Amino acid sequence: MGATILACWFTADTHFGHGALRALMRRPFDSTAGMDAALAAAWNAAVAPEDEIWHLGDFAIGHPDPAALLAGLHGRKHLIWGNNDPPAIRDLAGWASSQAYAELEREGRFLILFHYPLRSWNRQSKGAWNLHGHSHGRLKPLPRQFDVGVDPRGFRPIRLADLTPGAGPTSGDAA
């Protein structure tokens, strides 16, 4: 029997160690080390060690010790591969699972997890949600589509329960 999950969290596009991305996205941190520390602190303040968390890609680029970083983050961690996740990141021992795509049911919702926002997805017409990263909050979502990346989510993970259709520019409409 598996461990009890207290909460299910999602995040994407942390880009730990990626100084060029920090500047490009105008993230409000004075340095890459400061960004990394703030993102890790926000993650650990939100996610309990027993929680489940899905990272939807672009975990770390250029970080000096991604294995130690991952080990220091709370939760049972799963990775959906992003375009900036090489095999060295995908294969870290700290991931509970590591894959290109996932379909799962949590809290009564069928979820499609992929790094990229999809135009169409499995069970879309039956109410399934598409959770993604990659776009850093810059795309208008389709109904039931959510960018869970740190840029549009206050630089912290978000619980599935807090994703509300129609709640803002990075949330899908209830249609």
Task: Go through each PLM region and give its residues.
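Active-site neighborhood of phospho(di)ester-bond hydrolases with catalytic His/Asp-centered motifs
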Residues: 11-12, 53-58, 77-83, 113-114, ...
